Amino acid sequence: MEYINKKLNEFNENIKGKKVAIIGLGVSNKPLIEYLYSLGAKITVFDNREQEKIDTDIWDKVTKYNLKYYLGEGYLANLKCFDYIFRSPSCRPDLPEIEAEINRGAILTSEIEMVLKLAPCKTIGITGSDGKTTTTSLIYAILKEKYKCFLGGNIGTPLFARISEMKPEDIVVLELSSFQLMNMELSTNIAVVTNISPNHLNVHKDYQEYIDSKANIFKYQDENGILVINYDNEITKDFAKQANGKVVYFSRREKLPNGVIFDEDTVKICDNDLRRHVINKKDVKIRGLHNIENICAAIAATKDLVSPEEQRQTIMEFTGVEHRLEFVRELDGVKWYNDSIASSPNRTIAGLNSYNERIVLIAGGRDKHLDYDPIAKPIIEHVDTLIVMGETAEKIKNAVTRELENQKKTLKIIKVANVEEAVKTAREIAKPNEIVLFSPASTSFDMFKNFEERGKKFKEEVNKL
């Protein structure tokens, strides 16, 4: 008998003729616009950019459907008398114009929140300051061998228009950022928090708001919910006190009686006296102890859904995700790695700790108001030459210089204007058996649209050499 999603059918009927505001014309909202338009919603779109900065693909939909639009400065002045407001992750939910509409009776939601509300199947959400994408990709890779899976959120494809394809036995896997979770009042069935450290403090009001946003991934679970958290991180460990359902810990450092641990170079599932070996470190292709943590998280999230043997097989074949310690090429005995995803000092520290070779490090980008002092010691320990660029160049240089003075050591630090100059400089100074690591410890927005564009530019310049 064919499955009928009653909740989806009710929504589809209800949205017909309703006034819908879509805030943010990112490419991910294109399927949302198409779907809501097909249902007969009266759509108005809003974006703080001018038209020439909006992707032509999505702007073509605005003109094709003859949608009302408001762009640029003061773009929300006409946000009035709407039934639904769909916000993109880059738009804060507490803007005065949005709050005024909510107080008037509008429903504030998002593509992700509607997926959680209307999907008829199990949902797994992954968040954290670092390791989200690798952990999400691993969970998806492990489960898709046995289940029909849908991958969405920060990676994969927008899923709102695909809810009609979902059946109760399927699984939705979502990578969720603090911006997506910010005003969320629904949680995933299984919630994974990889770790929490200061991040995006240029957007969030303070660190507590960032932490609270992350906590929404499990806050609304019932007693059947599962929360997978990092025992080695003080903040995620503390989340256990707020959990409504079952808590599953993973740890790289502690020998826990229950949960997923890394012991004797092996990832193990522990259930009191029963210990099941999943995979040995030598069989893992992705580098770094931080990736062992990501593997532990993925195993903890999927251990009730697949066997350890099925987990092992997928993990053995997993080669990682683009822009995450990605090998680019070897030239004259020097290996080049792209770690453009590293938008925080913690990410770069994890990258530095992944190599035994001496490193030429390229770092710097947009300033997120983070503390760069913690990165100084790992740089001095692993790096022969530091190349800095972007808004954070001076902050990184100053942090390292202070620590060099403390240790009475020296390190060559070179400031450059851009990625192209950084690659040329690294080519001139890197010696055989060294590696060049592009790990910015900063976001990309001072020079690029996103970290993907930044990483592609780095690879392009390296491959020109």
Could you tell me what each predicted segment is?
Residues 3-19, 29-39, 148-149, 279-385:
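Nucleotide phosphate-binding/pyrophosphate-handling subdomain across enzymes
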Residues 42-50, 227-231, 362-363, 382-391:
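Short internal beta-strands
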Residues 26, 49, 155, 232-233, ...:
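Residues in the short beta-alpha loop(s) of Rossmann-like NAD(P)-binding domains
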Residues 1-110, 114:
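N-terminal leader/targeting and accessory segments in enzymes
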Residues 72-73, 109-113, 244-262, 312-316, ...:
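Beta-strand->loop->alpha-helix junctions that form or flank phosphate-binding loops
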Residues 34-38, 60, 76-82, 89-231, ...:
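Phosphate-binding loop of NTP-binding sites
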Residues 59, 375-434:
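C-terminal helical cap/extension that packs against the catalytic core
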Residues 43-47, 150-151, 173, 249, ...:
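Short beta-strand "acidic-cap" motif of Rossmann-like dinucleotide-binding folds
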